[in-house]
Amino acid sequence: MTLSMKRVTGSWCSNFLYKGMSDVTLEKLVSLCKRRGFIYPGSELYGGLAGTFDYGPLGVALKNNLKQMWWKQYVDDRDDMFGLDSAILMNSSVWEASGHTDVFNDPIVDDTTTGARYRADHLLEDNGIENAEALSLQQMTDLIKEKGIKSPEGNPLSDVRTFNMMFATRVGARDSDDATTYLRPETAQGMFVNFKNVVDSFYPDLPFGLAQAGRNFRNEISPREFIFRTREFEIMELEYFVREEDWEKYFEMWRNEFFIWAENIGLDAKKIHELDVPSEELAHYSKRTIDFEYEFSFGTKEIGAVAYRTDFDLRNHSKHSGVDLSYMDKHTNERFIPHVIEPTFGLDRNLFAVLAESYREESLEESNEKRVYLSFKKEVAPVRVAVFPLLKNKPALVEKAREVFSSLKKQYGRVVFDDNGNIGKRYRRQDEIGTPHCVTIDFDTLDDNTVTVRDRDTGKQDRVALKELTQALS
């Protein structure tokens, strides 16, 4: 059940009462992201390319913060995890062994008038048919005819058929079938084919995991909802190797870990719902999967998952490659193929959820002004602190502001210097990009070494001694 995303808060600031809400539409987020340099349409100069987006300076900073937090939490701070960065291009036999060349398909229909293609399950869901992806191709075709469903342009639709979503490409100068490979549709296979390499290099005890964050490519028929469903995206993924008899224990462990992660990046646990995927909808490699879905304004959608992949991948790669991928327990001398728990975190989707969660609008009770701000956690915010000279045409103020800026830059890294426009406009600009604190250097600073520190969420301004500034910003 989707709950209301509306939240009302109030706080006193400069004698004005702010009335705020986090009820954000997709249109508002898209507008803010482009205006403030988070995310731009891909190839916009040439009319764009559907399903592609470019991350601007603030967007890539936000994405890197999330990625670094994830890596620290699941690799650096653990003693049972090994990081990898496998190639995007892989031998095509990898995808044959994994099953992707046969079953990595989506159901599609054609507009019989224009030739435009659409995801059949999406059209059915848009017309009130729930869990359409669990239906067979024939069931989808029958429902489209029975319900009289048309294309978005109002034209008749073809029968439903499958479409393989992998991007094929050629390797080298040869134009032959054996030169064909694919842009990877998932990061997982790069970890499975390196399982033996890591075991031979590090001799880890079970359970242990491999971690990877990287780009994936899927030829989506109907990219939609901004960066939620795109043709190029980043996934942060773990493959956790366990004994078969222990899979349920570690499945629950990683199930709980998702909520710890969500809290760390600032998501409201009440807006995250678990979907225990029905058996008929499971991926070909999975025996059990739980999707973690977040309440976006356009619906409750998946942003992560935990799957029990059994020994499907290692067993199939062992069979197709002819290489023994079993594991030798050095304590018991047992040899067996480990089973796998796979926690998956969609980086772009997690970022999208953080943007939606953080968006606030506030109107001043005593004026018609509206304030928009992003209530990022400090660890997530692309800019940690902004430093202002009160006036840009006063060299003494600018010099002192530069001195404070340099000091904070060494401590936090993500610090900006801003002297463009009046102080109110600078505050609003930093609010919209989610900067937690602004530090203003004024004439009093020159006399007593104090500065004004403004809090983003409350708008409250405090006078702070420079020697206590780090503590005030923590």
Task: Describe each region flagged by the PLM.
Residues 1-20:
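N-terminal amphipathic/basic-hydrophobic helices that include classical n-h-c signal peptides
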Residues 14-474:
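NTP/phosphate- and nucleic-acid-binding module
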